[in-house]
Amino acid sequence: PYVAPASTSYSAIPNRYHLAYTESVARHGSRGLSSYKYDALLTLMAQSAAENNYAGFVSPEVGKEFINNVNAITAANVGNGYGMLSGQGAIQHQGIGERIYQRDADLFANAAKQGLRVSYQSSGEPRATESGENFKLGFDQASNGLLANAVVAPNNPADNNSGKDFDKNTTTLYFHKTDNPDGTQKTGEAKERAERYQQFVANDEGLAEAEENVTNDPSMTTASHNLLSQIFTDDFLASIGKEEGQRIWYNTADGTKKGAANCAAGADPAKDANACGDAKKKIASEQDAAMDLYNLYIIAADMEQENTGSHTFNFDQYFQGQHAQDAKTFAWSLDAEDFYEKGPSYAGQDETY
């Protein structure tokens, strides 16, 4: 998780200069799972492993604990809202807002005297707006409301509630997709730019080759089997694959390719559309399953406040000892994907810029 900097790490304003303007650009804070996906697929896989008295697990006890962990993190995300800021994420942005004021208090005092205003913007993604709301909360509390009402009126408010002070700016802050978070579509130059980037991610041969090299790296195969072997039997793991007679789980209610929609237990899809899974997602290899488990492990670190009571989970146990190296391998894989898709990427391309 994000570690707040100490005041001693702030850089000083150069001699003979004075601060006239400041801007803070931030990604959303710690969040829960973006959708019912990793937990959904591992639930389906675990249901198969639990057949015949947990025959697919190394022991019934290990199987029951694994299932409880997955069910618990699902319940925590249903309670918090899939894709929404976690309690930890809210605290992070409150702290950023507080430190912005503390660092530049003189600037804001002068702004208040001159009748200047603060401009707030959001990509329109709910967790981004929620992050901004918490930033403003921290800023306003630290400044005793000095500029709480001195806000530039947004042309397109992010929402009608706490996000009413945030101007929804998808062109700048959500430029990578043609579909905006609210379901509208980009037009004109913004749409063309998003389409070029999406085409790059989907069809660029250089990008595909680079990512294939990462996927096929022997370290990924080894780490995936090592991780899963703590939980599942070798025979069960050998049954996963695309060959005839092997198993694939799709993110549907029964795990089949054309099964019904798969929604998290206890969720209300009318209020949380992300609580229902994308049927195209699947587990078709050990690596798929291992990466899903790793993704639960890393999101758990962002959900410490939600990891309590009836939905207490522990994914750290699967990445202890020699398996800490497995975690490093999976982290390398995700970092490589971001490097190639989001930049700098490979030499000679310019879409990520």
Regions found by a protein language model. Give the residues of each.
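Signature for phosphate-centric chemistry
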Residues: P1-R117, S123-Y353
